[in-house]
Amino acid sequence: LSANKISLNQASVDQLQQLQGVGLKKAQAIVAYRQKQGPFKSIDELQQVRGIGPAIFAKNKTRLGL
């Protein structure tokens, strides 16, 4: 991962909040999803997290990694 990418599988709640449109609740939802479902298999899977829709995904797509 390059320095400006955020790893969906390793990022902390604080790191996830750096994404556009992602506040505390959404960041916590991403971490909870990861704990329940296991590691993200693709960045597209982020859209399965409650509160993360296509618009938020599109804004952050280039900053996401696994």
Where are the regions a protein language model picked out?
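Short, charged, surface-exposed loops that flank catalytic or proteolytic processing sites
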Residues: 42
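Short, solvent-exposed mixed-charge patches
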Residues: 64-66
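N-terminal, intrinsically disordered low-complexity tails/presequences enriched in Lys/Ser/Pro
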Residues: 1-6, 11-12
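Residue-level signature of tetratricopeptide-repeat
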Residues: 31-34
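Acidic-histidine catalytic/liganding microenvironments
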Residues: 19, 37, 49
